[in-house]
Amino acid sequence: MGYILVVKPLQTQQVSKNENHLEGASHLETYSVCNGLAEKIQCIRKTKAYKLVVVKYRVNTTIANIRHRRNDSGPLHVLLVSYARTGSSFVGDLLQSLPNSFYHFEPLHFLSNPVLNYSFVEARSVLDKVFRCNVSSIEGFLKWQRKNKGYMKFKRSFNYWKECSRKNACYNGSYIDAYCRRHNMIIAKTIRIKLSDAIEIFNTHPHLNLKIIYLARDPRGSINSRTKFPVSQWCKRDPMCINPNYFCSALSEDLKTVCTLSKERPEDFMVLRYEDLSLDPFGTTSRLVQFLGFQSIPPETETFLNTHTSVIGNVRDKYRTQGVDYPYSTFRNSSITATSWRLQMSFKRVALLQTTCQTALTGLGFYSYSTVASLRSNINFDTNVDDAIRAFCSGN
C-alpha cells in the first residue's frame, strides 16, 4: 500500500477520469493528480482554490520492486552513456528486457553525429522530453524518424514495435507518449554525448528520477572493432571514433567525472564494464538490476541472457556466408566477443595503444600486456572495476 498527493477542486466541477494515469488508484474520479515532486510543488502553487487530499493506492509488484527513488510517484529514468563499439546495443537490449520498461535507442541521433558542442543544451532538452514521455513535442524528431527508417530507432524498442505495428501507429506522437506513460522505467541509450555533459541533467532537470549507467569497454577492443567493415566506413568520419588519441583522452576525462559521481551520487551512478558482463553475464546483471532497484534478475531478463550470450544468431550466420561478420547483432558468444581483439591485433599495435590509453586502462582496471604470450593467453588479468576506480580516484 502506498500514498499519492492529489488536488481536489473546491468547485463542484469534475475532472475527467482520463486525466488520472495511475492504474489501480481508488476513488480518484473527481481528483486532478499531481505526479512528481516538482509537479506537486507547481500544482500546489498554481491551485490556491484547491485542497490537498492523501489517497491510498495499491502498487503492483513490479513497481514495488523498484527502490532508491527520490520521487516515488514517477517512473525511474535510466540513461545509458557510452561510445561506439562498446557493447551498448547489447546492454540496451538487456535493459529493455526488464519488466515494465520502455526503451529509446539513440534518441539523439537526429541532432547530429556526434552531438556537437553547441547542441548539448538541446540534447539535454531532448532527453528530458524522452524521459517525461513527451517526444511529440520535440521539433523535427518524429519527422526525422519517419524519414530515416533504415536506422530502425523505434524498431529497436522491441516491445513497443510489436504493439505499435499492429495498430499502424509507430510514428504517431500521441500514441508513443501514451504508450510511454504506461511504463515505470524509461530507458535511453546514447553514444552521442560525453559523460560530463550527461551528468548535468542531474542539475538542470532535478525533477527526473535519474540513474546513469556509464558503460566502459577496453579501448583496445573498441578500437579493434571500429576497424572492421562496415563500421569503419562511418567511423572514419568521426575523429572521436577513429583516432585513439581523441578517444582515450575522452576516456581519461570521463574518469574525472566518474570520481566525482562515485563520491557524490553512488546511489544514482554506476560504472558497468562490458568485459564483466560478457565473462560473467548473470553475476554482473545481478549487480546491475540491484542498482536499478530489483531484488533479483527478473525471469524475462534471465531468458534474454540465456539466448543472447551463448549463441550465434541466425542473422550473423547469414552474413558469415558472405565472408562478413554482422557487427550490429546483439546475439553473441559473449566471452569470445569481449576478448577477440587479443587474438586479432598485433602485439605492436596493442603496445602502442597501451601507451596512448594508459590512464584509461589503469583507471578502469584493464591489464597492460608486456609479452605476446600473456596477450594471446585465455587468462583474464583485469582487476575489479570498483577497486580500480577507487585506487585511481584516491591518487587523482
Show the residue positions of the predicted features.
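Cytochrome P450
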Residues: 101, 113-116, 204-206, 265, ...
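A conserved segment at the C-terminal end of the G1
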Residues: 89-100
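PAPS-dependent sulfotransferases, especially Golgi type II membrane carbohydrate sulfotransferases
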Residues: 1-78, 84, 151-161, 227-230, ...
